[in-house]
């Protein structure tokens, strides 16, 4: 067994011995041993770049049918990815799921509003964190939905005030610091509003809406094993914290764009908020319309709307995605402002968080007045929201949404420098452009066969068996395809298939004539041989001296030329211009 002190190179060699060339596992014990050691080994980025262990482990993970091994490999790769991607090391510290944020809107772990001694929150947070590490694509959603149901039951029960501190992690936000998000009020009036809309229905609608709106951002849901999917809630909370800090700098600390619940636990907390306050959730269409103080609030009410759109929750982490996220929301902002009825809470632009929130306090009373009347209106608009996935990360138009997008790789290995580096948005966009135009390529390729046949063919081409090559099925299908492409594109020139056929016809005709072999003519089969079947006579002697006697004093070739035994004979026995030189039988020197 390999010890834990083995170097990465040794572990790589051992792993290579345990798998075949197609990454299929040949020695499961050795592979498990290597992964166990790698889990304990404090590997560095340089060692990963040098050994390419990440690629090997990922290939093994894809090929293996052992679920436990695949999970361990995936977790190992995620840990390495956090090591490689700059700025990812502090992600779990700054914003783990369901850890309450500070009163000023940032997710600072040292400043909490809820006492740490409360048992239910302290249990939920580590459990969610560990689940999020392993199954960050599935488990948090299940956990959050079950916690939502529990909270709904507890909120509807008669002992609501007694259980308030236990059921909600973030309740002190409303009671302790009302102005933190620019809204006046206490939990009591907000809870009274719930009587107008059944809380269970709102909660179910939000669950359904949350499921639909996972589609919008990337247009294709990323594979759970893709290397970019780590700590999604933590990362969006990290991004929000930085944006909110910038907002505090701009506004001089007089107002806070977001309450702590928005920056710490994006999805579960805000859905609870929206269910508790039907005034914020129900009139999502009316709150966003320009008729409500639109001069003061250009974007769709940044502070009243929770920052939990799928655009923030689903976007993958890493500094490289920060720019993408910002540009996505700016793009979204321009689309949505021009269409006020569709400006919903989940499509709020990130840039709206930076705007001043003066004048928003008056809006709440207006929203409360319109809360009951706009309930049905809000539900109608919600039905159209799953269709609003017209914005992609690369900013493509809505017509391109039917075209499947390639899975984006967050990390790439540069063979020139030998380093693993994050894939910048510019590079990925250029790659997509390169892959996006495969159609003109065949017409470019057809230029080469068109130019070659008319030119004088050098000697090596004559030695190529073009006839046999042309009968090859692959070449035939390729030439037919190219010919069809040219024909369908309206080109008047002949395709490569035509030129190849013409060339082969001409070559076959040329080759047939020189194929006549230049050899010696066979000797006449004479029945009598002088000196063998009969005696030699004077006529035989005269004939030898004065006449051509094939097989006796010389021979003919197939061209009718006579060679006696003192001549050198040059023949072409195969008809391919290869010479066979025969020395004289008799040398007179």
UniProtKB/Swiss-Prot annotation:
Keyword Transcription regulation included in the entry's annotation: yes
Leader sequence segment: none
Biological process annotations from GO: positive regulation of gene expression; regulation of transcription by RNA polymerase II
Record's keyword terms, sorted: Activator, Nucleus, Transcription, Transcription regulation
SUPFAM superfamilies assigned to the protein according to its UniProt record, in alphabetical order: Conserved domain common to transcription factors TFIIS, elongin A, CRSP70 (SSF47676)
Start-end of Polar residues biased regions: 276-297
Biased composition (Low complexity): 259-268
Cystine pairs: none
Role, per record: Component of the Mediator complex, a coactivator involved in the regulated transcription of nearly all RNA polymerase II-dependent genes. Mediator functions as a bridge to convey information from gene-specific regulatory proteins to the basal RNA polymerase II transcription machinery. Mediator is recruited to promoters by direct interactions with regulatory proteins and serves as a scaffold for the assembly of a functional preinitiation complex with RNA polymerase II and the general transcription factors.
Record-given protein name: Mediator of RNA polymerase II transcription subunit 26
Species of the source: Danio rerio
Lineage: Eukaryota, Metazoa, Chordata, Craniata, Vertebrata
